[in-house]
UniProtKB/Swiss-Prot annotation:
<dbReference type="GO" id="GO:0090117">
    <property type="term" value="P:endosome to lysosome transport of low-density lipoprotein particle"/>
</dbReference>
<keyword id="KW-1133">Transmembrane helix</keyword>
<feature type="transmembrane region" description="Helical; Name=S3 of repeat II">
    <location>
        <begin position="503"/>
        <end position="523"/>
    </location>
</feature>
<feature type="transmembrane region" description="Helical; Name=S6 of repeat I">
    <location>
        <begin position="290"/>
        <end position="310"/>
    </location>
</feature>
<feature type="transmembrane region" description="Helical; Name=S5 of repeat II">
    <location>
        <begin position="581"/>
        <end position="601"/>
    </location>
</feature>
<feature type="topological domain" description="Cytoplasmic">
    <location>
        <begin position="695"/>
        <end position="752"/>
    </location>
</feature>
<feature type="topological domain" description="Extracellular">
    <location>
        <begin position="602"/>
        <end position="635"/>
    </location>
</feature>
<dbReference type="GO" id="GO:0033280">
    <property type="term" value="P:response to vitamin D"/>
</dbReference>
<dbReference type="GO" id="GO:0031902">
    <property type="term" value="C:late endosome membrane"/>
</dbReference>
<feature type="transmembrane region" description="Helical; Name=S4 of repeat I">
    <location>
        <begin position="184"/>
        <end position="204"/>
    </location>
</feature>
<dbReference type="GO" id="GO:0035725">
    <property type="term" value="P:sodium ion transmembrane transport"/>
</dbReference>
<keyword id="KW-0813">Transport</keyword>
<dbReference type="GO" id="GO:0005262">
    <property type="term" value="F:calcium channel activity"/>
</dbReference>
<feature type="region of interest" description="Interaction with phosphatidylinositol 3,5-bisphosphate">
    <location>
        <begin position="203"/>
        <end position="207"/>
    </location>
</feature>
<dbReference type="GO" id="GO:0034220">
    <property type="term" value="P:monoatomic ion transmembrane transport"/>
</dbReference>
<dbReference type="GO" id="GO:0005245">
    <property type="term" value="F:voltage-gated calcium channel activity"/>
</dbReference>
<feature type="glycosylation site" description="N-linked (GlcNAc...) asparagine">
    <location>
        <position position="618"/>
    </location>
</feature>
Length: 752
């Protein structure tokens, strides 16, 4: 094989290593020589460009090996099959917590009624777990090979991945050696790490939270000072020498000692027990209200909202930095692809002095890139518009701005009818006024259901006469079926199905029709006094309930018809789709606190004698207590119950009941756990989520944040995605910065 010749003009400021002998597969040259290895080098350049563009699309680092075999492995690793396998493995190892001891496989979490759960035999879940750990070990090995040992040593996430795997395998071995009777499983606490390390956005979010902690801590310190000062004021105020009944009740109930006083005011800070804590003193003297009002105004209205503002400002700033890194990765990936492809221009003597990318070469690359068909087609059309003109670096970068647009689905053309009557009918039933009529009919159906629910509120299901409601439902369902068929006639089947609202509407109409036919087949036609005996699995009342619930659900079809409501609904859907990273962080936090809660409080909530039924045995329990409110299902006896308990605590309504119960059942130290959970979930995470909801809505309603229609087209074909909230604020990386970073690539040498 002929040795490739190094050019005198290096692409990125000078040849690295002082020579032209580059390792095979790592060198890209301005002139591709003709010879036995020319085809292989050509394929290598194409594959390198494909990988770099895919890295840019996914905001991945390009500092990986770029020889032929490594790129083959790299593309297989990031293929849909491998990534879905890895995601399923992460889901599986997290899901094991529901099956492992203590198992959540019971119908209820209430300690009074819960039967002994099925416990898996030793080795069953452990076998699944070790398979998952082996998949993670393979994942780590592939990452370590592709990015190299030097990168592995500097990457804390990869080092943490290795430590977590080693600790998990050691702990797994200990479990088997103790026949699954170990008192503590450390590896269960470490499992959420696998979810974190697999998401770059979760890593960025976690880093931003860590950077924002000092500012959060400063406001938290103010809150602590505020709480301590008013605790001392309260203890002094309600511990006077001449106490009236109100003072004494207040002191004994809420300010008996320092821990109780702190807890009472902390709960009041969350407004969970307002005005309960104030009532004993306020009932005797209205002047005592001043103390509680001032405390609430300063703490809840000023400091807590100040904390929200600081979290919004600081976190948004740090998120900008992380997103700036993502933007730089995209620009660096596309620039690397440009440099690789521009090195192929001189093949065969064409454009010997030109610098740019041949459109036909880029088209060949785009054919191999893993990209959705809509974006790929749009980009290829733009590339073809250049003809044989070389693409400059700037034009190459602008081409990939198409990735920042979401495709608006174009509806198929309507069927063409020759008959004037059919054309008029098509115009009538395809008009949006016909949708308004359908919405009015759906509203009338909903009102009829509401009327009968009100009239029959005090009537037992077995004594209800469903004749009139049954007739009305039959009429409405026939109209829904007729409406669906007329829309199919006007729009065509493909045109009808191209509207998501029609798919939703049509699917529910078919389900309603099947359910109504089943009801009529089993219980015959409605008639006065229509109360037949139960036949089959469901009674007439059960089938009517299902029918009415589907009709109520179908009423959601009005949302697309109301512009403002449609904007709000689309923004909410965008949040669901684009806030997965924050949902993942919440899953991690819930998982860790649930496992800790199980280890701390499993079995501490025990039903007292006389509380095994719903008989009024709780009459002796204090009003508002855990026992009187029958909160027995809120416990940490298994993973599912722990998750629900943590959710109820995050809402902070009546969370003082949990604090008091676990203090009595397990000890006063339990308050530390619940206060930490309140800080992490209700203060930090909820405020972060609120900040991002605000940013999302502001972006959605800002007309400047959307792309204008393309020139020469009647309407915009694309629009900005909700995912790119901050793109207009981010700073584009400079030319020198990109070339400098490319010159530092550990596995790629580019020469001209």
């Amino acid at each position: 094989m002929a040795e490739p010749q190094a050019e005198s003009e290096p692409l990125l400021g000078g040849a690295r290593g002082g020579g032209g002998d580059w390792p095979a597969g790592l060198t890209t040259y301005r002139s591709i020589q003709v010879g036995p290895g020319a085809a292989a080098r050509w394929d290598l350049c194409i594959d390198q460009a494909v990988v770099f563009i895919e890295d840019a699309i996914q905001y991945r680092s390009i500092n990986h090996r770029v020889d032929a075999s490594s790129m083959w492995l790299y593309r297989r690793y990031y293929s849909n099959v491998c990534q879905r396998t890895l995601s399923f493995t992460i889901f599986l190892i997290l899901f094991l917590a529901f099956i492992e001891t203590p198992s959540s496989l019971t119908s209820t979490a209430d300690v009074r009624y819960r039967a002994a759960p099925w416990e898996p035999p030793c080795g069953l879940t452990e076998s699944v777990e070790v398979l998952c750990l082996l998949v993670f070990a393979a994942d780590l090995s592939v990452k370590g090979y592709l990015f190299g040992w030097a990168h592995f040593q500097k990457n804390l996430w990869l080092l943490g991945y290795l430590v977590v795997l080693v600790v998990s395998l050691v702990d797994w071995t200990v479990s088997l050696s103790l026949v699954c009777h170990e008192p503590l499983r450390i590896r269960r606490l470490l499992r959420p790490f696998f979810l974190l390390q697999n998401s770059s956005m979760m890593k960025k979010t976690l880093k931003c939270i860590r950077w924002s902690l000092p500012e959060m801590a400063s406001v938290g310190l103010l809150l602590a000072i505020h709480l301590c000062l008013f605790t001392m004021f309260g203890m002094l105020l309600f511990a006077g020498g001449k106490q009236d009944d109100g003072q004494d009740r207040e002191r004994l109930t809420y300010f008996q000692n320092l821990p109780e006083s702190l807890t009472s005011l902390l709960v009041l800070l969350t407004t969970a027990n307002n005005p309960d804590v104030m009532i004993p003193a306020y009932s005797k003297n209205r002047a005592y209200a001043i103390f509680f009002i001032v405390f609430t105004v300063i703490g809840s209205l000023f400091l807590m909202n100040l904390l929200t503002a600081i979290i919004y400002s600081q976190f948004r700033g740090y998120l900008m930095k992380s997103l700036q890194t993502s933007l730089f990765r995209r620009r660096l990936g596309t620039r690397a692809a440009f440099e690789v492809l521009s090195s192929m221009v001189g093949e065969g003597g064409a454009f010997p002095q030109a610098v740019g990318v041949k459109p036909q070469n880029l088209l060949q690359v785009l054919q191999k890139v893993q990209l959705d068909s809509s974006h790929k087609q749009a980009m290829m059309e733009k590339v073809r518009s250049y003809g044989s003109v070389l693409l400059s670096a700037e034009e190459f970068q602008k081409l990939f701005n198409e990735l920042d647009r979401s495709v608006v689905k174009e509806h198929p053309p309507r069927p063409e009818y020759q008959s004037p009557f059919l054309q008029s009918a098509q115009f009538l039933f395809g008009h949006y006024y016909f949708d308004y009529l359908g919405n009015l009919i759906a509203l009338a159906n909903l009102v009829s259901i509401c009327v009968f629910l009100v009239l029959d509120a005090d009537v037992l299901p077995a004594e209800r006469d469903d004749f009139i409601l049954g007739i009305l439902n039959c009429v409405f369902i026939v109209y829904y079926l007729l409406e669906m068929l007329l829309k199919v006639f006007a729009l065509g089947l493909r045109g009808y199905l191209s509207y998501p609202s029609n798919v939703f509407d049509g699917l529910l109409t078919v389900v309603l029709l099947v359910l109504e036919i089943s009801t009529l087949a089993v219980y015959r036609l409605p008639h006065p006094g229509w109360r037949p005996e139960m036949v089959g699995l469901l009674s007439l009342w059960d089938m009517t309930r299902m029918l009415n619930m589907l009709i109520v659900f179908r009423f959601l079809r009005i949302i697309p018809s109301m512009k403002l409501m449609a904007v709000v609904a689309s923004t909410v859907l965008g949040l669901v789709q684009n806030m997965r990273a924050f949902g993942g962080i919440l899953v991690v936090v819930y998982y860790v606190f649930a496992i800790i809660g199980i280890n701390l409080f499993r079995g501490v909530i025990v039903a007292l004698p006389g509380n095994s039924s719903l008989a009024p045995a709780n009459g002796s329990a204090p009003c508002g207590s855990f026992e009187q409110l029958e909160y027995w299902a809120n416990n940490f006896d298994d993973f599912a119950a722990a998750l629900v308990t943590l959710w109820n605590l995050m809402v902070v309504n009546n969370w003082q009941v949990f604090l008091d119960a676990y203090r009595r059942y397990s000890g006063p130290w339990s308050k530390i756990y619940f206060v930490l959970w309140w800080l992490v979930s209700s203060v930090i995470w909820v405020n972060l989520f609120l900040a991002l909801i605000l940013e999302n809505f502001l972006h959605k309603w800002d007309p400047r944040s959307h792309l204008q229609p393309l020139a020469g087209t009647p309407e915009a074909t694309y629009q900005m995605t909700v995912e790119l909230l901050f793109r207009d604020i981010l700073e584009e990386p400079g030319e020198d910065e990109l070339t400098e970073r490319l010159s530092q690539h550990p596995h790629l040498w580019l020469c001209r």
